[in-house]
Amino acid sequence: MKEIIIYTDGACSGNPGPGGWGAVLAYGEHQKEIAGAEADTTNQRMELMAVIEALKAIKGSGWEIRVYSDSAYFINAIQKGWLENWQRNGWKNSKKEDVANQDLWKALIPLLRKNRVRVEKVKGHSGDRWNERCDQLARNAIKSLG
């Protein structure tokens, strides 16, 4: 089975402030770019929105998907088991505080379960062409807010 490759990025002008997200999805020779923006948000919310919207754009289930992100927040939550711990602990973090962005994490969980998703860290602003493209999509989305 072929793999769907997803690159994502989020950006914020001020944190909080106007924010945007961008994603590139690639399957074989096919490629799709998506982006969006919110008037008042945070960088971390935009990073998560990029992943959520990219996974929503995939039709069907059972796909092999690899998500590349420069967000340590997203990558660590998945790879280090933070997300599982948060769920198990009633959405409290290690400091017994409410987990930030619960609404987005809760929206992400069924999307992760629908397919076989692996996540990988990409260094931001390091010349990776797809990460740079996602950053451009996110920044253009912010500009579209006016």
From Swiss-Prot:
Its cofactor is Mg(2+). Binds 1 Mg(2+) ion per subunit. May bind a second metal ion at a regulatory site, or after substrate binding. Gene3D superfamilies: Ribonuclease H-like superfamily/Ribonuclease H (3.30.420.10). It is found in: Cytoplasm. Pfam families: RNase_H (PF00075). Keywords: Cytoplasm, Endonuclease, Hydrolase, Magnesium, Metal-binding, Nuclease. It catalyses: Endonucleolytic cleavage to 5'-phosphomonoester. Monomer. This is Ribonuclease H. The gene is rnhA.
